[in-house]
């Protein structure tokens, strides 16, 4: 299934959390912090959003940092994604 976001929305997939701490302790699944770094898998067209022209600054494949509580989590074909607005993205990781 393909997902096509509307307006200034983007679809992201979280990157995997670290399995070990810096000191080498292996973390169980429940102790891992959800990462705030993700890869963009789909980008909306931008355009007129809330009466303002929005140009999309991100593209598919970009690695980004995003606000911890931003967007809506969805499950598609067994995979977890987050749909959020472009302004919830804090930075592009280069």
Curated annotation (Swiss-Prot):
Q: Can you quote a single GO CC term?
A: cytoplasm
Location of the protein in the cell: Cytoplasm
Checking InterPro entries in the record gives:
Chaperonin_GroES, Chaperonin_GroES_sf, Chaprnonin_Cpn10_CS, GroES-like_sf
Pfam families in alphabetical order:
Cpn10
One annotated GO molecular function is: ATP binding
Key words of the record? Chaperone, Cytoplasm
Superkingdom of this entry's organism? Bacteria
Q: Which GO terms describe its biological process?
A: chaperone cofactor-dependent protein refolding
Gene3D superfamilies, sorted: GroES chaperonin
* Protein's UniProt keywords contain Nucleotide-binding: no
| Quaternary structure note | Heptamer of 7 subunits arranged in a ring. Interacts with the chaperonin GroEL.
Name the NCBIfam families for this protein: PRK00364.1-2 (NF001527), PRK00364.2-2 (NF001531), PRK00364.2-4 (NF001533), PRK00364.2-5 (NF001534)
Q: What does this protein do?
A: Together with the chaperonin GroEL, plays an essential role in assisting protein folding. The GroEL-GroES system forms a nano-cage that allows encapsulation of the non-native substrate proteins and provides a physical environment optimized to promote and accelerate protein folding. GroES binds to the apical surface of the GroEL ring, thereby capping the opening of the GroEL channel.
Similarity annotation: Belongs to the GroES chaperonin family.
Q: What is the name of this protein?
A: Co-chaperonin GroES
Source organism of the structure: Clostridium botulinum
What is this organism's lineage? Bacteria, Bacillati, Bacillota, Clostridia, Eubacteriales
């Amino acid at each position: 299934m393909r997902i096509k976001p509307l307006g200034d929305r983007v679809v992201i997939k979280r990157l995997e959390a670290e399995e070990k701490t810096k000191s080498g302790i292996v973390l169980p699944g429940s102790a891992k912090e959800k990462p705030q770094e993700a890869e963009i898998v789909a980008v909306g067209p931008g355009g007129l959003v809330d009466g303002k022209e929005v140009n999309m600054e991100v593209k598919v494949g970009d690695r980004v940092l995003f606000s911890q509580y931003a967007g809506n989590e969805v499950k598609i074909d067994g995979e977890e994604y987050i749909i959020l607005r472009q302004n919830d993205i804090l930075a592009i990781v280069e």
